[in-house]
């Protein structure tokens, strides 16, 4: 039986699988609620002093501004004509889509808005968004790797797993940053999959992907801005933890939290919900932190750090949708 006969069955199966996978995170989240106890979680939420919430919100604002600056710096290096303020608004919209999609894949909605606002090609916009997200992911993996060293005596397998993923990502990044190697990959693996009549168009698309691509020297500044973004995010989360008088050194807590963020990127949960909380509860048991406290720290940090800016991004989308005659952000 030919592949074409199986194709509808395979596509139907994949559609069902894609719909089901994000539910896994929700199931984990509900299980944690029941296992820990809803009353304990509510009690922990209500015990957070308001001043610590305001400090966390302030750090979130600084983080979003710096994230915008990082993305804008990359855009400038790519000769993309767009203002920092527009990047800021696009980033808020990305936060909205991140919070409602598995593996934060919604952040790539920025491809559409960058193209629309700067009138560049889809390929160049794709590279811009991919590079911004790749820098973020590499930094997060590096910080998570450091965190895994802090708990190596308890869970050495976490270090080995993160190290393997980190090395694969770095090798891919270094490989694809060079146009010749990127062309070779497309010609060897991807181009043969397409009909002969459209292969010339594919060649042109690959060329546009590398149009004005920043050099390694160009991404040093965005890298360090991105590093400061993740450090501030860690401080934001620790602010909530400090409100509970969690007896963990700040460095240890922040770097261990990064591991839970990496786990939250698995495509089995919407916005990392459930997976992130479950992993952090598991890891902080080493330090004797009550599960209800850890659950609230993680969830509250997610609400302030992602849901809140995502809510503002959602309002921007509504304003754009219902504003007559306004095509731009």
Q: What are the language-model segments listed below?
A:
Residues 88-119, 202:
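Extended non-transmembrane interhelical loops and adjacent amphipathic helices
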Residues 94-103, 258-273, 277:
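Transmembrane alpha-helix interface/packing and boundary motifs in multi-pass membrane proteins
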Residues 84-87, 106-108, 119-133, 290-300:
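Membrane-interface alpha-helices at helix entry/exit sites of multi-pass transporters
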Residues 105-116, 270-285:
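Re-entrant/interfacial helical elements at transmembrane boundaries that shape
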Residues 93, 97-101, 126-148, 296-311:
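Membrane-embedded alpha-helical segments of transport systems
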Residues 1-92, 150, 156-265, 298, ...:
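Predominantly cytoplasmic-facing regulatory/coupling regions of multi-pass membrane proteins
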């Amino acid at each position: 039986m030919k592949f074409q006969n199986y194709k509808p069955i395979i596509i139907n199966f994949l559609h069902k699988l894609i719909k089901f996978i994000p539910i896994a995170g929700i199931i984990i989240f509900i299980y944690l609620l029941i296992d820990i106890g809803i009353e304990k979680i509510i009690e922990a939420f209500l015990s957070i002093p308001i001043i610590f919430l305001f400090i966390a919100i302030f750090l979130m604002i600084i983080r979003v501004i710096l994230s915008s600056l990082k993305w804008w710096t990359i855009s400038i290096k790519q000769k993309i004509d767009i203002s920092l303020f527009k990047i800021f608004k696009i980033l808020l919209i990305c936060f909205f889509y991140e919070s409602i999609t598995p593996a934060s894949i919604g952040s790539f909605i920025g491809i559409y808005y960058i193209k629309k606002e700067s009138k560049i090609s889809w390929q160049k916009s794709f590279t811009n968004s991919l590079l911004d997200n790749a820098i973020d992911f590499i930094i997060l993996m590096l910080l998570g790797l450091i965190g895994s060293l802090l708990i190596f005596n308890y869970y050495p397998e976490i270090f080995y797993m993160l190290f393997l993923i980190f090395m694969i990502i770095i090798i891919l990044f270094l490989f694809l940053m060079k146009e010749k190697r990127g062309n070779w990959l497309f010609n060897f693996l991807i181009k043969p999959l397409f009909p002969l009549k459209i292969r010339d168009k594919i060649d042109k698309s690959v060329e546009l992907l590398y149009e004005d691509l920043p050099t390694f020297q160009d991404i040093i500044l965005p890298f360090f801005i991105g590093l400061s973004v993740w450090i501030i995010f860690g401080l934001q989360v620790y602010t909530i933890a400090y409100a509970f008088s969690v007896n963990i050194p700040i460095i240890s807590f922040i770097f261990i939290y990064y591991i839970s963020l990496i786990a939250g990127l698995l495509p089995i949960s919407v916005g990392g919900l459930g997976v992130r909380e479950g992993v952090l509860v598991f890891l902080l048991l080493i330090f004797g932190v009550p599960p209800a406290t850890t659950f609230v720290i993680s969830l509250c940090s997610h609400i302030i750090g992602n849901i809140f800016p995502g809510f503002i991004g959602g309002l921007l989308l509504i304003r754009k949708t219902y504003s007559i005659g306004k095509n731009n952000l």
